[in-house]
Amino acid sequence: MATAGNPWGWFLGYLILGVAGSLVSGSCSQIINGEDCSPHSQPWQAALVMENELFCSGVLVHPQWVLSAAHCFQNSYTIGLGLHSLEADQEPGSQMVEASLSVRHPEYNRPLLANDLMLIKLDESVSESDTIRSISIASQCPTAGNSCLVSGWGLLANGRMPTVLQCVNVSVVSEEVCSKLYDPLYHPSMFCAGGGHDQKDSCNGDSGGPLICNGYLQGLVSFGKAPCGQVGVPGVYTNLCKFTEWIEKTVQAS
């Protein structure tokens, strides 16, 4: 399944004016220098599909709710759960679910991607299993140096599509370094990870995908600087510890 085109290319010029070098949204995200995930080792991973093409990722955080990046917003969604390969028809243990209600964070700032998260309500609850399972959101904010796992189906470093879900470990970068690298775009709703000498990174096909730290959902793929996988240039993630109250209230109210 091919990734859709970059939905935020319309404001690339604005971003280039703000920061030396061009930036790219995670919404065509590739996993750089990662490897095949163990099958169904990330049972919370969701694929947001439109016209049979992956356009973003998401994370199952409740039997009827998926968390994703706000810049992935659409009027309706087909969401794949329990998937390892996007090429397999009716993969055992998988489920395709429709969704028509999504709630973007009220302070989401599209040009700058601050507060870049939204909740998508599935039309029906899913039954959790070995291949489909929700994950808890971290209540503690990330610590610099922590090793975390990011996953996705986007393009590989060689430009080819992976046949199965890809995983890569990246380290959290300090707020001081992150804010300097992405000034003036940086916002407290963001944090950085990656940018090490191993050039491991998330990048263009996977906005809204999960960053898992210590078994908890710590962040969502948001954006980064092109080309991906540069030494000293980490990717940017939505800092979910800042939004636990909003997420809980939104789920309860709907």
UniProtKB/Swiss-Prot annotation:
One of its GO terms (cellular component) is extracellular space. Keywords: Amelogenesis imperfecta, Biomineralization, Disulfide bond, Glycoprotein, Hydrolase, Metal-binding, Protease, Secreted, Serine protease, Signal, Zinc, Zymogen. This is Kallikrein-4. SMART domains: Tryp_SPc. Residues 27-30 form a propeptide. Expressed in prostate. It comes from Homo sapiens. Has a major role in enamel formation. Required during the maturation stage of tooth development for clearance of enamel proteins and normal structural patterning of the crystalline matrix. InterPro entries: Peptidase_S1_PA, Peptidase_S1_PA_chymotrypsin, Peptidase_S1A, Trypsin_dom, TRYPSIN_HIS, TRYPSIN_SER. Zn(2+) binds at H40, E91. Residues 31-252 form the Peptidase S1 domain. N-glycosylated. The N-glycan structures are of complex diantennary or triantennary type, which may be further modified with up to 2 sialic acid residues.
